[in-house]
């Protein structure tokens, strides 16, 4: 068996196109232009790349894009004041603070300062609590992308056995809640779970988000299972360079899985696309409009 490759690049492009069509509709019919504000603190090169990508894709979708760059030594009070200003700005419907923040800043306090209605990263305790309670909420973008990718393979996840390897607040925990909302039967595991290979081998859906390069091996996977690899790890090559790999040993797992996401080109492609989805949904909710079709 050779696994079907779940091409995140193509799926994300289609999702962005759907968002753009909905944005055009709400702008034309309702006079609403969704707006996303991204706050970047410091000059971390990787963060700058992510922010540029978000800016480009936000504008391409027809949304308003607002960038706010602050120095690494910015005072906590100044950062919180900016967030308060964005909370009150009617042209801003989504607020994202690029993480990680420089040392000395209280990340939890910053996230908690964002208006939950504009929390398009889905990290505010209000949204996390609503998600855990099975209520409508803005969900973190990467787990949302995982669900969308899974549903390109399976029209319904209802009744399927799923395992989430990883328990972070950013991916693992919210992904479990989203899967429960899809009526999947979910096991949450982590690097210290006992007999992890046996747990994983029972799953129809495997989500690897533990941050360990190529940890999930071929003999962990039930034949025909769908494998969603959230990991992004850089490892050295014999030539003295580095390459990106996921948490799944891709080449060997692809021989037994029914479908699998590559790294790169899988889940990572979906994160910004789902950020656009959340921004559109937030804009409609704030304006008292029906939930968009995407």
Curated annotation (Swiss-Prot):
Keyword tags: Amino-acid biosynthesis, Histidine biosynthesis, Hydrolase, Methionine biosynthesis, Multifunctional enzyme, NADP, One-carbon metabolism, Oxidoreductase, Purine biosynthesis
Pathway named in the protein's UniProt entry: One-carbon metabolism; tetrahydrofolate interconversion
EC numbers for this chain: 1.5.1.5, 3.5.4.9
Keyword Glycoprotein: no
Classification via SUPFAM superfamilies: Aminoacid dehydrogenase-like, N-terminal domain, NAD(P)-binding Rossmann-fold domains
Top-rank lineage group of the source organism: Bacteria
GO CC term (a single one): cytosol
Binding site residues for NADP(+): 166-168, 191, 232
GO molecular function: methenyltetrahydrofolate cyclohydrolase activity; methylenetetrahydrofolate dehydrogenase (NADP+) activity
InterPro entries: Aminoacid_DH-like_N_sf, NAD(P)-bd_dom_sf, THF_DH/CycHdrlase, THF_DH/CycHdrlase_cat_dom, THF_DH/CycHdrlase_CS, THF_DH/CycHdrlase_NAD-bd_dom
Entry function: Catalyzes the oxidation of 5,10-methylenetetrahydrofolate to 5,10-methenyltetrahydrofolate and then the hydrolysis of 5,10-methenyltetrahydrofolate to 10-formyltetrahydrofolate.
Protein family: Belongs to the tetrahydrofolate dehydrogenase/cyclohydrolase family.
The name this protein goes by in its record: Bifunctional protein FolD
